[in-house]
């Protein structure tokens, strides 16, 4: 059995609304560690008080263990590298797990972070749409970052209907870049 954990990079409702859905994992494995910045943990505490407040005892409520991240951390004997990025003007995190890096809701990645992204097998990064957006990468921005990082494979996530139909967009992408989809499983070393 694989240990279940969560790393939160931001607190937008669409990204954290599923927190309550970790119940089945809690029933199976017990306490679930959550890794996030202090800002994100504070917001989660307010939004999901019944989960985080220890003096509230609601049967079936998942037990989470919060871990404030400011730097790299260890999970299940693996180093997780914290990657700084920006969602518009808001600082957020991406994460590198071995040879896979994951970003969502990114608009910019500071230049000093790129050295942490060398020799990737897989990069998962957002590409919201074709047109510019004030707080998300568009397709061209994402492709420029992919070209700079040079992962073996890249998957575009956090895409909207404004990007186009899957088949039409996919055939225009470089051969190592793929549109992600629900249920996708990615293997890497």
Per-region residue spans from a language model:
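Short, well-ordered beta-strand core segments
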Residues: 6, 100-101, 123, 154
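Divalent metal-coordination and catalytic microenvironments
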Residues: 10, 44, 80, 105, ...
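Metal-dependent catalytic neighborhoods of phosphoester/phosphodiester hydrolases
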Residues: 18-26, 164-171
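Active-site neighborhood of divalent metal-dependent phosphoester bond hydrolases
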Residues: 29-31, 40-66
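Short internal beta-strands
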Residues: 32-39, 153-157
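Core dinuclear metal-dependent hydrolase active-site scaffold
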Residues: 61-112, 182-189
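Binuclear metal-ion centers of metallo-dependent hydrolases, dominated by the metallo-beta-lactamase
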Residues: 110-124, 129-189
């Amino acid at each position: 059995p694989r240990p279940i954990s969560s790393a939160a990079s931001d607190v937008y409702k669409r990204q954290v609304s599923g927190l309550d859905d970790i119940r089945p994992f809690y029933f199976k494995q017990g306490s679930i560690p959550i890794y996030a910045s202090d800002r994100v943990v504070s917001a989660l505490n307010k939004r999901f008080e019944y989960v985080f407040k220890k003096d509230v005892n609601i049967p079936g409520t998942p037990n989470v263990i919060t871990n404030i991240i400011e730097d790299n951390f260890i999970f299940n004997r693996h180093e997780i590298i914290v990657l700084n990025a920006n969602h518009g003007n808001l600082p957020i995190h991406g994460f590198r797990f071995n040879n896979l890096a994951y970003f969502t809701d990114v608009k910019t990645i500071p230049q000093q972070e790129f050295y942490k992204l060398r020799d990737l097998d897989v990069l998962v990064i957002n590409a919201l749409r074709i047109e510019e957006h004030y707080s998300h990468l568009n397709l061209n921005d994402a492709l420029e970052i992919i070209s700079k990082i040079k992962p073996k494979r890249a998957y575009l996530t956090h895409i909207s209907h404004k990007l186009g139909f899957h088949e039409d967009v996919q055939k225009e992408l470089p051969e190592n870049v793929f549109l992600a989809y629900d249920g996708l499983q990615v293997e890497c070393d």
